[in-house]
Amino acid sequence: MLQKHSASGCPNKQGKNTACRPRQNGEYAARGGTETPYFFTGNPKDFSDQGFWRKFFDAKTDSISSFVIYAKNSKNRTQEPGEVKANPFGLKNMLGNVMEYCADKYDPKAYSKGGDNVTNPLITEGEEWVVRGGNYTSDAADVRSAARDYTKHDAWLKTDPQQPKSIWWYSDIRGIGFRVVCEPDPAIGAK
């Protein structure tokens, strides 16, 4: 289950601002400085188990399985970060394992708005939140850097016993989480 909105409510023991990150920051971090579907070599179509040709030819999964926890190698559960190699930024599990809950509201036209001059890409209007990156049940084609979906608020709260329904956690979804971002330590940046 996901503790919704928990990053913004984290105890501020370090004296820094913390938050869930916006979708574009997450995509940049997941790409590890690259501009390709994955931060490693490969084509989503080659890794995917979907499609007509998969009846005759196996998917090429050696490279993706080294970096991503997804349906083919997850054993139907999340895995520890040490199970995969890091991306060029040194980050693990940026794709797959769990979908990332983002600070943005979902807008299906988000990428067509604003053009190249967007200074604050955070979308604050809408009903559902952005989740991205696929999870341990996803096909390889759905664990790309740009893979984006949205929360299904009512469906993810069906068995929540609280009345009114909780605003803090989703009772009916597995494979979703969030990353906390915080402002950098000025002492480290000066070195």
Enumerate the language-model features and the residues they cover:
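Signature tryptophan residues that serve as conserved aromatic anchors
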Residues: 1-4, 26, 69, 99-101, ...
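Short aromatic-cysteine micro-motif
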Residues: 1-36, 71-92, 178-179
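Surface-exposed recognition segments
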Residues: 34-35, 42-55, 74-77, 94-191
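Conserved beta-strand positions that form and line the central face of beta-propeller blades
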Residues: 37, 66-69, 80-83, 116, ...
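Structural motif
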Residues: 59-62, 171
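Short, charged, amphipathic alpha-helices and their helix-cap/turn boundaries
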Residues: 61-75
